[in-house]
Design a protein with these regions (language model features):
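A conserved beta-strand/loop capping segment in the N-terminal third of enzymes
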Residues: 51-102
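Glycine-rich FAD pyrophosphate-binding loop
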Residues: 25-44
């Protein structure tokens, strides 16, 4: 049997896989891109794309989404900080966003296959890689790229498994927009838990969710907390004053909202990489004829869980390395480009969700920002993706010492 032979086989057609396929195909490589997700099935993700990513790849603005110019941050005690963003970000439905990037890859010349590829059906020989799909089709190629998410079996096979402490959990609901379409974008830090809740309005629905560490995850109480947040959000959209975490939860208004959401909201859940500093030091995400991209490589912010920027940037760095004839330089490229930033975020995670001057750091951070324009500006830059963690403490102190 004659098999099509490709230069690069890419498993996973999310942002990392599709963008890599586009860049490689435009550079002249013969690329096969495998999308194993059922058509129309969304990835469990808030869908936020930072201003930093939009500036780096302005073509993303052509995808159907919602541009966000204002954001409400809430402390664990529900103190509110309203940010008018100098650098807007965007929120996308992952179905629309992933489809847009996959179509760009196809238009660039990549061969896209709606086939699921599992790690146990991948074999390696002196001549390269052989992939077999669940349907029985086969392909061969010289180079293998895994971009199939945080649960990637291929990544486990090539780079070894991650520890539970290196993973985070996100879960939530896709729910209808408020009747008046008055949908604010909200991030609310959790009381007595590591992590935060979000409400991200998209063109036709709202993505609600909670992100926390896998070590801290307890579904029952966190799901109850999320429902409290969701019902409070809709009450707030109706003009009521709401304390998300400490208000009355047994009111008739909340019960009516919850009854409606129980029949209309769609649940989702996912694991997100949140690697420790120790793991960043030791993890290798590429070899002579293979590479990991995006979540499959562990490339996500350990504090916020944000991964789309790192998915796209890792794809770009890998494509640069491969097309230059030196794919082995990918490892050095990502470490020099964003490796130190993610390692610093890993070091900061415990402190970010720990205590500072007798209260949660997130509480103090929002308190300071409410009273100081300089600190507020730094937080706005952090949301935009323009402020990194390496010099965050220095920037906060420097701005806090300036006159208000």
């Amino acid at each position: 049997m004659s098999l099509d032979c490709y230069d690069v086989l890419i498993v996973g057609a999310g942002p990392a896989g599709s963008f890599a396929a586009e860049l490689l195909a435009r550079g002249g490589a013969r690329v096969a891109l495998f999308d194993g997700r059922p058509e129309g099935e969304p990835k469990a993700c808030g869908g936020g794309v930072t201003a930093k990513a939009l500036k780096a790849w302005p073509q993303l603005l052509n995808a159907v989404g919602r541009t966000i110019t204002e954001l409400d941050l809430y402390s664990p005690s529900s103190k509110r900080l309203h940010l008018v963003l100098d650098e807007p970000f965007a929120i996308y439905s992952r179905v629309a966003f992933d489809c847009y990037l996959r179509d760009r890859a196809r238009d660039a010349g990549a061969h896209v296959f709606a086939e699921k590829i599992s790690a146990r059906k991948i074999t390696r020989s002196d001549s390269g890689w052989r992939l077999k799909s669940d349907s029985g089709s086969e392909w061969t190629g010289a180079f293998l790229v895994a971009a199939d998410g945080a649960n990637s079996g291929i990544a486990k096979k090539l780079a070894g498994p991650l520890q539970p402490s290196d993973m985070e959990v996100a879960f939530g609901y896709r729910a209808p927009l408020p009747a008046n379409n008055n949908a604010a974008t909200v991030v609310a830090f959790l009381p007595a838990w590591v992590g935060y809740a979000w409400a991200f309005p998209r063109p036709d629905h709202i993505s609600f969710g909670i992100a926390t560490t896998q070590d801290a995850f307890e579904h029952g109480p966190l799901d109850q907390l999320l429902w409290q947040f969701m019902t409070g959000y809709y009450l707030q959209c109706e003009g009521q004053k709401v304390n998300f975490w400490h208000g009355k939860t047994d009111t008739p208004e909340r019960a009516d909202i919850e009854d409606h959401l129980r029949t209309s909201a769609e649940r989702y859940a996912a694991r997100i990489p949140g690697l420790s500093a120790k793991t960043w030091d030791s993890r290798t995400v590429s070899g002579d004829d293979w590479a990991l991209l995006g979540d499959a490589a562990g490339f996500a912010d350990p504090v916020t869980g944000e991964g789309i920027y790192y998915a796209l940037r890792s794809a770009e760095l890998f494509a640069e390395a491969y097309l230059s004839g030196a794919p082995q330089t990918y490892e050095k490229k990502w470490r020099e480009d964003f490796g130190a930033e993610l390692r610093r975020a890993a070091q900061m995670r415990r402190r970010f969700y720990g205590n500072f001057w007798g209260a949660p750091f997130t509480e103090r951070m929002i308190e300071f920002a409410r009273g100081h324009r300089g600190v507020k500006r730094v937080l706005g830059d952090l949301v935009a993706g323009e402020q990194g963690y390496v010099d965050l403490k220095k920037k906060l102190v420097k701005n806090a010492l300036r006159p208000v």
